[in-house]
Curated annotation (Swiss-Prot):
InterPro entries linked: NCBP2, NCBP2_RRM, Nucleotide-bd_a/b_plait_sf, RBD_domain_sf, RRM_dom
Pfam family, one: RRM_1
Protein name (Swiss-Prot/TrEMBL): Nuclear cap-binding protein subunit 2-like
Source species of the chain: Homo sapiens (Human)
Domain RRM: 39-116
GO cellular component labels: nuclear cap binding complex
Length: 153
């Protein structure tokens, strides 16, 4: 396939985002290589009320291996993200292609590649136990726990 044709056939939904996990212990090029081969998705912008069952329902046309719901590290309640392990890269690519921008529980979800789930990764990294981005939110969102934690202090 020519270089020009490859550019035309590129699917922007499958490209790597600029986000990199800062807790990854290897080098940047190693992380990018793993991301390009990964069959694990990180789903974000989920409602705090989204359940594992709803994620299974969303992936009903795919055969998935595991779902790891993101948890507030203090309260052990959902905090708006999850990891979905697919059996192969093709299933993960289809999910990425068709689920990015889908509305679930009145929230538009976003998907990104992840190098693979590691124990402890399911916990939010914010000071209050949830996601960092929710701590600085200044507006009220009932689906994401109300006001941001830092704005309440």
């Amino acid at each position: 396939m020519s270089k020009d044709l490859k550019i035309l056939c590129k699917d922007p939904a499958l490209e790597l985002s600029c986000y990199r996990d800062h807790q990854f212990s290897g080098r940047k090029f190693q992380q990018e290589k793993l991301l390009k081969e990964s069959s694990t998705l990180n789903m974000g912008n989920l409602s705090f009320y989204t359940t594992e069952e709803k994620i299974h329902e969303l992936f009903s046309r795919s055969d998935i291996r595991n779902i790891f719901m993101g948890l507030d590290k203090i309260k052990k309640t959902a905090c708006g993200f999850c990891f979905v392990e697919c059996h192969n890269r093709a299933d993960a690519e289809n999910a990425m292609r068709f689920l990015t921008g889908t509305c679930l529980d009145e929230w538009i979800i976003c998907t990104d590649w992840d190098v693979g789930f590691r124990e402890g990764q399911q916990y939010g990294r914010g000071k209050s136990g949830g996601q960092v981005r929710d701590e600085f939110r200044e507006d009220f969102h009932s689906g994401r726990g109300g006001f941001g934690r830092q704005t309440q202090i």
